[in-house]
Amino acid sequence: VKSAKPDVTVLALVGTDHHPFDRMVNLVDELLAGHDPSDGALSCLIQFGTAQAPSSAQGRDFLAKDEVKEHIDRADLVLCHGGPSTIVEILRSGKMPLVMPRDPERGEHVDGHQQRFARHMAGLGLIQLVDSVQQVRAEVEQFTAGADERLNPGIELPSPAESALRLGRIVDRLTAAAPAQRWWRRGGRRR
C-alpha cells in the first residue's frame, strides 16, 4: 500500500523593495496552477510587495517581521528574493532557502547585489538557486518524496545581537589601526 504524499506549504517572499517582482508572483501562480492534487495538497502564501497580487496563491502585500518569522517556521519550503537579511532569517529557521534573486535588467532592483550574494551563498551550499517553475516544482517533489534532509543546511548562525557585537569589534580594530588624518577642512570642503 502506497502512503499518501504529504501536504506541502510554500512561503514566497519578495521583500520590501519598491520595485515590483511580478516574476516571482507569476512563478508561484504557475506552480499552483500546474499542481496535481493527487500529489498531495499544495498551499502557497506569497508576500508580494508592490507586485501584482497573485491570482491563484494566497497573498499579502506586506508582512510584519514577526509574521514573516512565524510563516517561515510553519512553511515546508521557503522561496525568497536574494536579500541577505531574508536569506539569513530563513537559514536561522533551519531551512535551506530557495532563492530567486531580483534582476536589475528586468527592472526588479537597482543593481545586481542580490544576484552576486545569491551566487556566493549557493557556492557555499547554503541556498538553492531557482529561476523557473520547473526548478521549484522539483524542490516540492523532492520534499514530498522524503528528500527533505537536503533542505536543511544544518548550520548555526550567531544571533543578530552577537553579529552586531562582532561587527563592532571589527570596526573598532579598523578605526584604531587607521591613521588619524583629517580628510576635510573647516567648512566641510575637501582639500
What are these regions (language model features)?
Residues V1-R74:
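Donor-nucleotide binding loops and adjacent catalytic segments primarily
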Residues H19, F62-E70, H81, E108, ...:
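Residues at secondary-structure transition points
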Residues M24, D111-F117, E149-L151:
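Class I S-adenosyl-L-methionine-dependent methyltransferase catalytic core
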Residues L42, A138, Q142-R191:
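C-terminal amphipathic helix plus adjacent low-complexity
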Residues G59-L63, I127-V136:
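Short acidic-hydrophobic, aromatic-tinged amphipathic segments that line or gate anion-handling sites
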Residues V68-V110:
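A donor-sugar binding/catalytic signature common to diverse glycosyltransferases
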